[in-house]
Every structure is written in C-alpha cells, then in structure tokens.
C-alpha cells in the first residue's frame, strides 16, 4: 500500500479540507499512522485527538515522511506539513485512499441504534456466513473478524474503530477473500468523523433513546440523534424500525437522500405508529413464543418490494428476549437485501450465541444468573421487565454500576428503571469509573432510586465481591442480574484498562466453587 502526495492533496482539495502545505516535496507514503509508537520510515503521520507535540517529534525521529495536522508544529520542522481544517475528515479520506478503497469490494451492512447493535450484527453475520460460504467480515463491539483463520479474529477496543484502523481491517478482509461486511456504527464515529466519506449498501436504524449525553460525548439529545441519522444519509438502502422514538425525524432524514423504493420499514404487528406522507410498513412480525431460552416469531411482507425478497416465514432465535426479535427481523431483512434467503436465516438464527448478551448461568442452589450488557435506562428496563414476565422468581437481585467521564444520563436512567421494575435487592458497584470515584457514581445512581419501592440497596465497589455477595444471598428460585459489562475483560480506571475476569467468568467460577 502507498499514497503519493499529488493525489492526496487533490483529494483534500476536492473535499475543501486543505488549508496549505509547507516544505512541500515529492514523496510517496508507504505507511500511515496516528500512533507515534508505530511509525516507521516512510510514514505519513496524523496529529489527531489527544495529540501532544512530543508525539510528532518521536514520529519524525522514527522516519515519518510528512505530517497532517490542523496547524504547524516546530517539532515537525523540515517535514512536509499538510495543514487541513479538519484532521479527522482528512485522516478518513487519506486512509481510504492509502488502503485502495477496500470498501468498494465489500457489500457493507451498517447498524446503528441505542441498543441492539451487537445482537443484530451477530444475527446478520451468521445468516450471511451461511449464504456467502463464510465470506463475511464482522466489526462489532465485541470482535473484529477479518477472515476465517484464528489469527484473523481480534477483540474490539471501540464499537467503530479509528478510520486508519477501519480501512486497514477492511483491506485485510478483502485480501482474505471476504465479500461482505457487517459493522456496528456508533454515534461517536460520526461525531468525531471517523467514517467521513464511507458509504454503505444497507444502513439499519434500530432505535433511539437518550444515552451518551454529557461531557466528552453529545451535548444534547438532538446532537445524538443527528449523529445517529447520518448512517441513513450515507446508505444506498435504508432499513428502519418504525417503532423507534423520533420515527418521523428518522424517516425524513432517510427520505432526504434515498428514494422511497429503497427505504424499508418494519414493525411488530399491531404497533401504534403514525406514518408520515405515503410511508408504508413493509414487514411486520408477530411473536409466537418466548421463554428464557428462545424466541419464535412470524415475519410477513406487506408491500410489493418487500414480497420480492421472499422472506416470509417462521423464525426461531436462541437469544431470548422479545426485544431481540426486532433485532433478528432487522438482520433477516438486511441479509435478504444482500442476497441471503429465508432458509439461510432459518438454519442459522437458532444457533447464535452472543457473549454477554442475555447469557444464562444455572446453579443448583443459588438460582439463575443472567449476564447482560444492559447499560442504559431502556435496555435495563426491558431486560428486567422480560425476566419478570418469564419467571416466577422468588427474589431478584441486580448488580450494576455506571461509567465515569461519560454517559452521565445513564445514572438517572438506571435509577428510573430500578424504581419502575422494583427488584428486591440492588448492589451498586464499579463499572469503568475512569477518573471519577466509583462510590460517588454509585451514590448518584442511588439518589435517583425511589427507596419506598426499592428498599434494599447495598454499596460494594469491588465488582467481583459484589457479584459473589449477590450469588451468596440467592436461593434456588431466585435471579441475579449482572448488568452493564457483559463480556468486557477490563475496567477503565484512571486512564488505564485494568484486566478484569468478566462477569461471566467470575459468576461461573464462583458457582463451581460453591457447588463442588
């Protein structure tokens, strides 16, 4: 891979990003990086994010051939300086060019929503693995899968990677023979222009509810919604859950750049929805069976364009939760738009396992433990409401915390969900506190709980101890809900990723010790 200065500057000019160039020479970059630790001879270096001038000095010392920034730095003296008005946009465009536009060789399904992105991504990944003979790549909150060999699978650091990493991984997927890609897209990816210029074949909008609002994230819900909607603006075909909040806004955003015949709407049968203009529900689904182990539903095409996909039928998923049926429907339709058949979905959906999503751990003497990534008001409420409907549990204990430095709106949201669903006991603990004091976060959550409705609340800042306390206090017919972290293998504390065994492993190991 390489990038010559002349087409690079032309590309920046085309997007009105280039301010000026200092010390211009004729060069070809043979690598690109925003991390000075990874710079080698011939690298085009990007000064991004939490940049410090010393990083540029280090990059220069290691052989950087030029740098891209929003201003010139003395530390880069003697190097060609490509000065732009938006470094993140420039990095995305030049990253795509350096890796020779791998997105053009992939059918890309992109998914956004406040909740359900990962579950939908895994459903679609399994369906398309069946229909493409495993020529499918996956970029999710949990994993980045670039091929079919063990060395092609990595743990994810971000829901949507930095642009250079994203295009690097796309290139690797294409070189590994992948023809399709399913990827989650976060609102932050648009807020920070990580995916500027990237287009999708199918864009899925699952839902929207207040989240990621506060310092270091989105200043308002309107800003959060706007960033989510950008996925539809950049998609050739749009698939929208018509039951989402702000549906009219979302629909009009899609319609502004997409022809009506390329917009597909789905909803649960009987849902109370006000449809704008001449919009029609294209697919409806009806729940036929739900329990703690699986869900079964019927999908019906209502419009001519929907009927052409031949996706009518009954489907069964191994991921419980009535709310996950909508995620499965989105995956079925999107996969159908990518060429998959109804049979591909029927054969695969009942075999999908997603780590840390409604993961159930049984015990002989301490009830049932559920591990779920529920990390905001909407997802926690839906999880607790579902478990309440599906079980005759004696006591329900919830273990949770809230992240520090971001997502401040989650704290009142947790208090509201707990008040409304009224578990018998709550243990407030640590969950990625960042630079905040976890006890302060826990007490803030507690301040939003109605103590007349939730009477038993404990504080235990060691999460492993909190989990063990919850299990110790539970009997045969009881339920323990470990919410918020799912399969996260670390705690973010004071700027470091501190290794953490994961909620699943801690609970399983402790149950095994107790029942030995």
Regions found by a protein language model. Give the residues of each.
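ATP-dependent carboxylate-amine ligase
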Residues: 1-17, 41-44, 49-52, 334-343, ...
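N-terminal leader/targeting and accessory segments in enzymes
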Residues: 1-93, 97, 316, 320, ...
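Short loop/helix-cap segments at secondary-structure boundaries that form the rim of catalytic
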Residues: 39, 59, 71-79, 147-149, ...
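Non-catalytic positions within long, well-ordered alpha-helices that form the structural scaffold/packing
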Residues: 60-61, 174, 196, 419
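Short, polar loop motifs at secondary-structure junctions
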Residues: 65-75, 140-143, 243-245, 267-271, ...
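Acidic, Mg2+-coordinating active-site environments of NTP-dependent enzymes
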Residues: 75-77, 202-369, 447-450
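Phosphate-binding loop of NTP-binding sites
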Residues: 91-242, 246-261, 391, 515
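Structural beta-sheet core signal
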Residues: 138, 183, 203, 240, ...
């Amino acid at each position: 891979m390489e990038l010559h200065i002349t087409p690079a500057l032309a590309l920046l000019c085309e997007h009105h990003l280039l301010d000026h160039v200092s010390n211009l020479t004729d060069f070809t970059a043979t690598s690109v990086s925003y991390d000075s630790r990874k710079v080698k001879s011939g690298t085009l270096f990007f000064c991004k994010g939490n940049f410090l001038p010393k990083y540029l000095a280090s990059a220069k010392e290691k052989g950087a051939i030029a740098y891209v920034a929003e201003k010139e730095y003395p530390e880069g003296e003697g190097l060609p300086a490509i000065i732009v008005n938006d470094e993140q946009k420039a990095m995305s465009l030049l990253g795509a060019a350096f890796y020779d536009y791998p997105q053009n060789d992939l059918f890309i399904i992109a998914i956004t929503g406040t909740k359900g992105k990962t579950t939908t991504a895994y459903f679609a990944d399994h369906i398309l693995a069946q229909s493409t003979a495993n020529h499918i790549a996956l970029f999710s909150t949990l994993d980045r899968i670039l091929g079919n060999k063990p060395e092609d699978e990595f743990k994810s650091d971000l829901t949507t990677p930095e642009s250079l990493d994203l295009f690097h991984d796309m290139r690797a997927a294409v070189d590994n023979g992948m023809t399709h890609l399913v990827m989650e897209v976060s609102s932050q990816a648009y807020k920070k222009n990580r995916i500027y210029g990237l287009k999708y074949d199918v864009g899925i909008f699952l839902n929207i509810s207040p989240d990621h609002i506060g310092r270091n994230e989105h200043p308002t819900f309107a800003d959060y919604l706007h960033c989510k909607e950008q996925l539809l603006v950049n998609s050739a075909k749009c698939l929208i859950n018509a039951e989402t909040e702000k549906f009219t806004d979302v629909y009009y955003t899609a319609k502004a750049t997409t022809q009506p015949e390329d917009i597909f709407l789905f909803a649960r049968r009987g849902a109370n929805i006000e449809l704008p203009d001449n919009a029609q529900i294209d697919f409806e689904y009806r729940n036929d069976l739900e329990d703690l182990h699986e869900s079964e539903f019927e999908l019906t095409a209502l419009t001519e364009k929907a009927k052409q996909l031949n996706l009518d039928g009954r489907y069964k998923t191994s991921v419980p939760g009535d709310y996950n049926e909508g995620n499965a429907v989105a995956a079925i339709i999107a996969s159908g738009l990518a060429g998959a058949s109804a049979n591909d979905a029927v054969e695969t959906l009942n075999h999908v396992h997603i780590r840390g999503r409604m993961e159930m751990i049984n015990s002989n003497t301490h009830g049932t433990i559920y591990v779920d990534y529920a990390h905001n008001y909407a997802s926690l409420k839906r999880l607790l409401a579902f478990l309440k409907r599906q079980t005759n549990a004696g006591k329900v204990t919830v273990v949770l915390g809230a992240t520090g430095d971001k997502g401040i709106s989650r704290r009142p949201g947790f208090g509201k969900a707990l008040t409304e669903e009224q578990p018998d006991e709550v243990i407030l603990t640590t969950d990625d506190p960042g630079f905040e004091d976890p006890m302060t976060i826990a007490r803030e959550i507690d301040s939003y709980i109605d103590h007349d409705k939730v009477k038993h609340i404990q504080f235990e800042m060691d999460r492993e101890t909190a989990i063990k306390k919850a299990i110790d206090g539970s009997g045969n017919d009881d339920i323990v809900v470990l919410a918020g972290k799912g399969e996260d293998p670390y705690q973010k504390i004071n700027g470091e990723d501190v290794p953490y065994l994961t909620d699943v492993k801690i609970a399983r190991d402790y149950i095994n010790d107790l029942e030995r």
